[in-house]
Swiss-Prot record:
Ranges where the record places region Disordered: 245-285, 336-379, 457-492, 555-586, 603-696
Endpoints of the signal sequence: none
Reported function: Cell cycle-dependent nuclear envelope component required for embryonic mitosis.
GO biological process, one term: chromosome condensation
Organism (species): Drosophila melanogaster (Fruit fly)
Segments of this protein annotated with the region Rich in charged AA: 448-696
Protein name: Mitosis initiation protein fs(1)Ya
Residue numbers covered by motif Nuclear localization signal: 512-520, 534-538
Keyword annotations of the record: Cell cycle, Cell division, Cytoplasm, Mitosis, Nucleus, Phosphoprotein
Acidic residues: compositionally biased ranges: 557-569
The keyword Phosphoprotein is annotated on this UniProt entry: yes
Upper lineage: Eukaryota, Metazoa, Ecdysozoa, Arthropoda, Hexapoda
Amino acid sequence: MSFSNVLIMRQPDEGKCHICKRVFCCGKCRQKHQFKAHAIAVREPLGLRSAGGGIIEHRHQMESGATTIYVFCPICERRPLLLREEMHGELLAHIETCHLPLRCRKCQRNYTRVDDLREFSKCVDQQQSCTDVTGATETSKATLKKAANSTAISTQTSPSVTPISLINMRWKAKSRVTHEEFISDSVSSIRNLSSFSNSSIRRSIGQLGVNPSETMEKGKVIRSTSTPLHVESVFAKPKEPITFNASTGGHVSSIYHEEPSPTPESNPVQQQQQQQQPLQQRAWKMGARNKMSAATPLRQVMSKSIQKAFVEHGGMMVHQPPSAVVQRRVRLDLSEHSSHEAAGSSALDLRLSPAMRRTQSESSASEVNSGSSSSYSTSRNADLCKRQFLLSAQKLTTESIIITRTNSSSQKTSSTVYNSCESVEIIRSTSESAEVCHVPAITPIRVTGAGINKKQIKFETPPKSSQQMRSNGEGDETKDQFFTPEPGTPEIPERRHRQAIVPRQLSGEFSPKKDKPKEKGLAVMALISPPLQQPRVRPPLRECRQQRVYSGVQDVGEPEVVDAEEEDEVFRPTNASTCNDKKLEAPNSGRLWSLMSSMMRLPASLRGEREKDRDRDRDSDKENAGSGSLIRRCASIAGSLVRPSARDSSMEDQQCLKRKRTQTLDSQYCSPLSPSSSSKRYRIRPREPIERMRRQ
């Protein structure tokens, strides 16, 4: 900040010109500047007071000794011009030259001539006189901005009263009254009016409109504050129906809204008690709504389950009798003598889920009287029978789910009715045919058309005795019933559909010496004969060491006679699609390709022996002559593809040691159309150069 700016800030207002805002060194220099540049010399003084008119006459004594009267234009000084009957001619000439046209702030009248300023009339706005005129011209720099069309009072007529816009005040007060009538008991609304009642608001509005002078003395300013004022806790207010407006749906009722009674007629004794009940209310009940709203406001954050509970719990207000409107209030007195007076149900408890309500009502009783209207009017025993409608927050169904449970306790009978829709006719039709019946506790009934709740689905595991009976063949009629199996129950062999795994070995040189012609015969029979449909039991792993070891998946054959002790272990692939494809393919083509792939995988040392065994089996099998020719043709093709190579014993031992690493239980399934990866490695094995030159 520079030094010159500091000097300007420290200078008082007496060094600044009031019109052009120029700054001078002192007040005398500023006064000389104003009288020389901005003052209007007046010939005849009018004797106007400075407090009354706003135009101040300044007497300036010249150096020659003569006294001159000067007047400053209020418009140039950015002050309102008050029109009077007597005005200086020099001032009017200055206004005509510099400031015309003018517009009144109150009545928005335009003054375009000086004669209009002389022959003016009082502008009347809401019975208040206004003679303020401001300038709005573009030729002068000292003109004021055009005032907006507002109703604000320009000047403060009294130091004790704040200027208030009367129209805005009326509109705000009227809107508050209308708003209070509609949502007076809303859960999410809090009144911010500081007035004591609606009548005081209307009285203050009337006083403001009729006589403003009396309003300044007697009327009270209505204002809204940011702090909630609980006026109703001190002063009693009339009872009003409770509504709930903090939801998106139109059918949502209040928490304390009660179910309408299905019987339109009521006991006359109860009507008399209901008429006397408002007189017996205590004074502290008046502030019940404010206390409850402070506890749970329940705005727009309600879950869908709570909204459904509101829809099920509260009915429409149209179906209620006039006597039930008085009952829709906040009941803070929950004593026993006043609870049975109401014809509806108790308040909905949102803390309990439907499962908890069913658990708590295990020991409750059900009694539905067929002549409900006659019993209400004739006997007083209906007061002892309290009907509680516990409404579940489940999905709405097309029918009514009514579950009755019976229990007698202290000569009082209460019924629990689970009602999922507002169907009074179904309840009436059920109540006419139903009597007091003792039924054991049951699970909620599955109604046609109702959505299944995930929490209601219950899986049960059958006992072991039923499983043993089913295994013996006694439970054939219940095969379609499925249950969740127990983890400790042993599995039944007939239900096992798991396919086993084939122990794979590349060659049969390291397998134990067995009857190889018999093995080859079984392999050929498995390729020709159709496969068996019955799955077999997998033996324990300890017995696998005593079984045969085969060179490939396709070389394994299944015997025709199945014996649990003597049959060879064959592990099938676990993929169901491959099993189905294997069954659906043609017998000759599938066997042909499987035989070709098996022959291509066989080592060269066993090829000649396998050809002899296949020729011997072909002679012994007369009915399968066609397939035998295919086998012989396939063997010739495989012999042309797999070329024998002369190896010494050292090379064979080294190859055997290398092949031992691939002996494993492989769970993957090899397609018969493509050879395995191990056979590919054997075929692409490089040959010695001397053998290659000899064959070429």
